Amino acid sequence: MYEVIRRLVDDGEWFDLKTQFAKTIITCLARMGGRAVGIVASQPRQLGGILDNDSADKAARFVNLCDAFGIPLLFLQDVPGFMVGTKVEQAGIIRHGAKMLYAVSRATVPKVTVVLRKAYGAGYYVMCGKAYEPDLIVAWPSAEISVMVRRAPSTSSSADRSRRPRTPRPSERSSSMASARSSTPTSPPGTL
């Protein structure tokens, strides 16, 4: 992602903020066409660029900083979504993600979003996705934007599926139930 930033900004120079904190997201100030710009970019080389509690906080603070000083925002997306699991849920991933969501939604500066490779689920949404109505949103021709990650079935789930008994189709169920009813002996009325 740093190579992309280097090619976009004037003289290939930028000022990174909080480089040692929440490494799955990059927040930096740079110049593009001589004008100051704030860049929020996912870092796919760190945990695939997934958003967690710290990265959501880092991005929210940076967006608020840029908005306070009237610095336009550029979002570079290569994000698989938010971290999931009991540990992050107990640490408040919803609360931290909401901070980022609120910061991006209330920012009044111009916003541009570029989807470079992948943008899935809530990660796409909070990184200034279409719902925020950015001033410009573009995607690389091979980029994937989706609610869920598209995955091939794993071999273990395929093997499990082959061992399970096949569930009959609705048409098969109704015919088998009808034949079961006709072969069941009936008792005279009033008896068990």
Range-by-range predicted roles:
Residues 1-192:
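Ligand-binding clefts of soluble mixed alpha/beta catalytic domains
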